[in-house]
């Protein structure tokens, strides 16, 4: 899947200047932040909770660990990891978008999750953390919005401890023709109408559908992780490959 030229990239199906994409993506998430959780439940029929639960179980977080929830948005994974790592552990919820970060902070504080979570506005391509710092990094439904995915994956490798684990949960490519046809119909005909009804913003959800189609498929993303230096890379398809969880280790 082409990422464009050195100076250009994809914003959905559009080709844009690479330096413009971050601002354009920011505009999408500023627009949808307040209704993001509601839309996740509606557009996935609640199944996103099952995908995230599998990701958390696969992470194997234990008391005392340091976890980075990258592109953590409204904090679904952070909330679970906070309980798993306990008082001696630390979870960092990082997101490039300050609107999403604000929603996540308020949501977790309303739940009483305050002691072992910190919040950082950060670009995945240049993470502001020391080398060999985290035991686990997760990025759920965020990588496809990153301009330079290869740089982001290398940045994640740098801040992982030796023996650390990266988990990428992302929309991917359905494995069967029937599912692909149903998924296309849903994504391009129904999803934007849902976005218009719930958030008064059909255009942002058109972008989200297009960004999923432009994201590297399962094997391509696996290869990108291997090229960055991750080892024992594997992926698990869920819901016929509509979503895939990629996992790799730093040794």
Curated annotation (Swiss-Prot):
Reactions this protein catalyses: a 2-demethylmenaquinol + S-adenosyl-L-methionine = a menaquinol + S-adenosyl-L-homocysteine + H(+); a 2-methoxy-6-(all-trans-polyprenyl)benzene-1,4-diol + S-adenosyl-L-methionine = a 5-methoxy-2-methyl-3-(all-trans-polyprenyl)benzene-1,4-diol + S-adenosyl-L-homocysteine + H(+)
CDD domains associated with the record: AdoMet_MTases
InterPro entries given in the database record: SAM-dependent_MTases_sf, UbiE/COQ5_MeTrFase, UbiE/COQ5_MeTrFase_CS
Gene3D superfamilies: Vaccinia Virus protein VP39 (3.40.50.150)
Chain positions recorded as S-adenosyl-L-methionine binding sites: 74, 95, 123-124
Pathway where it operates: Quinol/quinone metabolism; menaquinone biosynthesis; menaquinol from 1,4-dihydroxy-2-naphthoate: step 2/2; Cofactor biosynthesis; ubiquinone biosynthesis
GO MF assignments: 2-methoxy-6-polyprenyl-1,4-benzoquinol methyltransferase activity; demethylmenaquinone methyltransferase activity
Record keywords: Menaquinone biosynthesis, Methyltransferase, S-adenosyl-L-methionine, Transferase, Ubiquinone biosynthesis
Residue ranges crossing the lipid bilayer per the database entry: none
UniProt EC number: 2.1.1.163, 2.1.1.201
GO biological process, one term: aerobic respiration
Primary enzyme class: transferase
Function field: Methyltransferase required for the conversion of demethylmenaquinol (DMKH2) to menaquinol (MKH2) and the conversion of 2-polyprenyl-6-methoxy-1,4-benzoquinol (DDMQH2) to 2-polyprenyl-3-methyl-6-methoxy-1,4-benzoquinol (DMQH2).
Family matches, as PANTHER family: 2-METHOXY-6-POLYPRENYL-1,4-BENZOQUINOL METHYLASE, MITOCHONDRIAL (PTHR43591:SF24), METHYLTRANSFERASE (PTHR43591)
Family membership: Belongs to the class I-like SAM-binding methyltransferase superfamily. MenG/UbiE family.
Alphabetical list of NCBIfam families matching this protein: MenG_MenH_UbiE, PRK00216.1-1, PRK00216.1-3, PRK00216.1-5
Protein name as annotated: Ubiquinone/menaquinone biosynthesis C-methyltransferase UbiE
């Amino acid at each position: 899947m082409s990422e464009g030229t050195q100076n250009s990239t994809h914003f959905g199906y559009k080709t844009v200047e690479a330096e413009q994409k971050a601002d354009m993506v920011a505009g999408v998430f500023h627009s949808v932040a307040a209704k993001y959780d509601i839309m996740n439940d509606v557009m996935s029929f609640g199944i996103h909770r099952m995908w995230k639960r599998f990701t958390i179980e696969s992470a194997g977080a234990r008391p005392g660990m340091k976890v980075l929830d990258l592109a953590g948005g409204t904090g679904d994974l952070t909330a679970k990891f906070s309980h798993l790592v306990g008082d001696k552990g630390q979870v960092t919820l990082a997101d490039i978008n300050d609107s999403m970060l604000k929603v996540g902070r308020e949501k977790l504080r309303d739940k009483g999750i305050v002691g072992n979570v910190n919040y950082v506005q950060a670009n995945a391509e240049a993470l502001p953390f020391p080398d060999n710092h985290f035991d686990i990094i997760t990025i759920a439904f965020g990588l496809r919005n990153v301009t330079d995915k290869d740089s982001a994956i290398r940045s994640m490798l740098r801040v992982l401890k030796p023996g650390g684990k990266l988990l990428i949960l992302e929309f991917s490519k359905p494995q069967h023709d029937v599912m692909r046809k149903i998924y296309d119909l849903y994504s391009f005909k129904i999803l934007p109408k849902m976005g218009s009804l719930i958030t008064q913003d059909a255009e942002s959800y058109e972008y989200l559908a297009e960004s999923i189609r432009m994201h590297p498929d399962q094997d391509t993303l696996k290869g990108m992780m291997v090229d960055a230096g991750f080892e024992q890379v594997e992926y698990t398809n869920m819901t016929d490959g509509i979503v895939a969880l990629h996992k790799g280790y730093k040794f």
